[in-house]
Design a protein with these regions (language model features):
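NAD(P)+-binding Rossmann beta1-loop-alpha1 motif at the extreme N-terminus of oxidoreductases
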Residues: 1-30
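N-terminal glycine-rich dinucleotide-binding loop that anchors FAD/FMN and/or NAD(P) in oxidoreductases
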Residues: 22-39, 171
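Rossmann-like NAD(P)(H) cofactor-binding subdomain of soluble oxidoreductases
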Residues: 31-115
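Rossmann-fold dinucleotide-binding core
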Residues: 46, 82-163, 167
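Helix-loop-beta segment of a Rossmann-like dinucleotide-binding subdomain
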Residues: 71-74, 116-130, 179-188, 235-245
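NAD(P)-dependent Rossmann-like dehydrogenase/reductase catalytic/cofactor-binding core
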Residues: 148-149, 199-280
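Active-site-proximal catalytic alpha-helix in oxidoreductases
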Residues: 161-189, 193-206, 232-233
Length: 280
């Protein structure tokens, strides 16, 4: 779409993107080799109008210096992580920058050096400002326009706290169920104990959300089932992939943080406690 996009990468992925472009295999977009600018965090000296934060939750602290350096007075930062509360967390780390919050619905993974694969028909980005964040409607709509012109479904949220919690609830149930049983999502789509575990996790996070004062637009369990049933049957969560490879994973943010938050609110989470025994 002709947008000026820069990727921050490192190691063999950076070398591959610089040498061969970013290789994209996509059920939605087809096969592409994208010639995109790529730098290490240390090399990048430019200023960005919009910064999408796509690292895993455990790496957020490592990018704060880059965000500070790459921001100008009108920059907006949009985290699209899986873990709830990321926007306020980054805002505390970079108080001089406008940080929104967001989440993304997509099944994608790194399939090789400088190569990503997107599966299925889901690709939607949701973002918005927390109540204490001052940002103009014009800025929010400008970001939406750029995303839509790039073929991305983009929604401006009127309650980003709710929408990021809903995403956390979904991805937590998906990743934890998949990792606990070591199965792809096709097994969650069938009636039986795997699907029942997914439902139990969804019910428990929904109870936590209600206790936190979040007003859901629809039943969160039905919503999570609707999303899971749309996924390609062979898809797995990134936490699952990382654990299978012995890599660092998001198990803290997607499993143990949910249990901690429930404890703080006096919510009983028997299904979460059951699956947590496997990962202690």
């Amino acid at each position: 779409s002709g947008k000026d996009v820069t990727c921050i990468a490192r190691g063999e992925h950076l070398a591959a993107i610089r040498g061969n472009g970013l290789q994209l295999h996509s059920d939605l977009k087809g096969e592409h080799c994208l010639k995109v600018a790529a730098f290490t965090a240390e090399e990048f000296q430019g200023k960005a109008d919009v910064i999408f934060v796509c690292v895993k939750g455990y790496s957020v602290d490592s990018i704060t210096e880059l965000i500070k350096r790459a921001s100008h007075e009108r920059t907006v930062v949009i985290p699209i992580l899986n873990v709830y509360g990321t926007g306020p967390r980054i805002q505390r780390l970079v108080p001089g920058v406008t940080v929104l919050d967001g989440c993304i619905y997509i099944v994608g993974f790194v399939s090789g050096r400088g190569e990503i694969t997107q599966m299925g028909k889901i690709f939607r980005l949701v973002y918005g400002a927390h109540r204490s964040t001052i940002v103009s409607r014009e800025t929010l709509e400008a970001v939406q326009r750029d995303l839509q012109e790039s073929g991305i479904k983009a929604d401006i949220s009127d309650d980003i706290d709710r929408d990021t919690f809903v995403k956390w609830s979904f991805i937590s149930a998906m990743a934890v169920t998949g990792a606990y049983y070591d199965v792809p999502m096709g097994e969650v789509q069938k009636p039986g104990k795997v699907r029942d575990t997914f439902i139990g996790l969804s019910q428990e996070s929904a109870a936590l959300g209600r206790k936190l004062g979040i007003e859901f637009k629809e039943d969160i369990v039905e919503y999570n089932l609707k999303v899971i049933d749309k996924l390609a049957p062979e898809s797995t969560a990134s936490m699952q992939k990382d654990m299978a490879k012995g890599h660092q994973s998001e198990v803290q943010g997607l499993l143990f943080d949910m249990i901690t938050a429930a404890e703080e609110q006096g919510i009983e989470v028997l299904t979460y406690r059951m699956v947590a025994e496997k990962f202690k």
